[in-house]
């Protein structure tokens, strides 16, 4: 089924997802603040939308914007005014609180709203192999399901409230952060006993801890290879903050949260690592006794 789709936000993830929609035969209207990213997609067959409103007026539109501030600046009532009867899929990892505030904005504009943050890195997005965490009204989900199937290997249906998808994404990332910290602490201990970090992380990933976090990030930690980042420490700190918001909203007091907040603060302030290091660089706090 071919359709005209809008896509707003062409960072590394958004560009990969928009490319995937093009590859699956769709007409894609793209918008981004940086025109270089737009030009790359146009060269692949996309069409440029002059404004966010033009992209949002497509039959189904998607956004993959960088943070809450960017989402609030782009997905305004004015921009949605011409999208009545359409459906929007918000795929950014935003705060559940913002997702809830946006609900009435979409409703008043007559636009269906699906929250659908994703699990996966840019190459996974480009290959259409994402895990998609989707929540929204049944009618809106049905309208976008074929396109989500093109973008991901599995769509996880999480109910009718879009913000729940964002809360679940924050909870998943909270687990990833714990894994990164656990790898760092255990590598620090075994390395000081003379065990090769590469051997130790291979032991972890090939026995009890298979999966992309231990295999992929374990290798980065073993090699102390944190730049260029696949996902920056600055973004990791943002996602940890989102998890803290979810915990507060649900009345949970996580015992480990203060320690994780501390290691991110140390990495962000470190002259060698800093905010542009990969988020797995939190492993260095234990290895180097930074904190």
Set out the residue ranges of the language-model regions:
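NAD(P)+-binding Rossmann beta1-loop-alpha1 motif at the extreme N-terminus of oxidoreductases
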Residues: 1-64, 86, 122, 154
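Rossmann-fold NAD(P) dinucleotide-binding segment
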Residues: 52-111
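Hydrophobic beta-strand scaffold residues
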Residues: 28, 48, 112-114, 155, ...
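Helical "substrate-binding/catalytic lid" subdomain
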Residues: 164-286
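Hydrophobic residues within alpha-helices
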Residues: 17-18, 37, 102, 147, ...
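Rossmann-fold dinucleotide-binding core
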Residues: 5, 93-173
């Amino acid at each position: 089924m071919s359709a005209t789709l809008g896509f707003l936000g062409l960072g590394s993830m958004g560009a990969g997802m928009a490319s995937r929609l093009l590859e699956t035969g769709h007409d894609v209207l793209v918008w981004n603040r940086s025109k270089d990213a737009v030009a790359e997609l146009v060269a692949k067959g996309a069409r440029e939308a002059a404004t966010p409103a033009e992209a949002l007026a497509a039959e189904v539109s998607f956004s993959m914007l960088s943070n809450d501030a960017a989402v609030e600046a782009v997905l305004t009532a004015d921009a949605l005014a011409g999208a009545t009867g359409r459906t929007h899929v918000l795929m950014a990892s935003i705060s559940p609180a913002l997702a809830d505030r946006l609900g009435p904005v979409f409703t008043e504009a007559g636009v269906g709203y699906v929250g659908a943050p994703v699990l996966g890195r840019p190459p996974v997005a480009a290959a259409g192999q994402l895990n998609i965490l989707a929540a929204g009204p049944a009618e809106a989900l049905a309208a976008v399901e074929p396109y989500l199937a093109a973008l991901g290997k599995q769509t996880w249906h999480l109910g009718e409230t879009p913000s729940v998808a964002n809360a679940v994404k924050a909870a998943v990332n909270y687990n990833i952060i714990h894994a990164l910290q656990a790898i760092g602490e255990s590598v620090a201990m075994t390395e000081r006993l003379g065990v090769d970090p590469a051997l130790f992380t291979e032991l972890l990933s090939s026995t009890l801890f298979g999966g992309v976090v231990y295999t992929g990030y374990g290798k980065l930690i073993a090699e102390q290879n944190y730049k260029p980042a696949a996902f920056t420490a600055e973004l990791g700190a943002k996602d940890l903050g989102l998890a803290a918001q979810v915990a507060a909203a649900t009345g949970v007091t996580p015992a480990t949260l203060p320690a994780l907040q501390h290691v991110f603060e140390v990495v962000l302030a470190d002259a060698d690592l800093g905010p542009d290091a990969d988020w797995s660089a939190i492993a260095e706090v234990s290895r180097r006794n930074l904190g």
